[in-house]
Regions:
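Hydrophobic faces of well-ordered beta-strands that scaffold small-molecule active sites
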Residues: 7-11, 35-39, 82-85
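Glycine-rich, proline-tolerant flexible connector loops at the mouths of alpha/beta enzymes
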Residues: 35-65
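Glycine-enriched alpha-helix->loop->beta-strand junction motifs that scaffold or abut catalytic
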Residues: 33, 96-99
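Glycine-rich anion/phosphate-binding loops
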Residues: 14-28, 65-66
Length: 99
């Protein structure tokens, strides 16, 4: 019996905290005929302390839950799966809530 290979479009954090870019990348991933789309749910407080030199960069990657809900809905409406990399309890809870 042959197993089906799942093809995943890895967006990661390529959306750069930008809602328009996240939607554009989502649209491209859906159009690419993949089985799933994967993002990194980045929240600065899960990755670093405020005194870390790249803390603000991580803060800029954060997006509001309503944006993630909208993105996940588009992906599900297209019949695709959504996967997330999570880095702590907050992003895990967010993934459960939106995905």
């Amino acid at each position: 019996m042959r197993k089906k290979i799942e093809i995943i479009a890895e967006v990661a954090q390529g959306y750069e905290g930008n809602e328009k870019l996240a939607n554009l990348l989502t649209k491209g991933a859906i159009a690419s005929n993949t089985d799933a789309v994967k993002f990194q749910l980045v929240y600065a407080d899960e990755l670093a302390t405020p005194d870390y030199e790249y803390y603000q960069l991580f803060k800029e990657l954060e997006m509001m839950p309503r944006i993630w809900i909208d993105i996940c809905q588009k992906i599900h409406d297209a019949g695709k799966k959504v996967y997330f990399d999570v880095f702590g309890l907050f992003s895990l809870d967010m993934a459960k809530q939106v995905g």
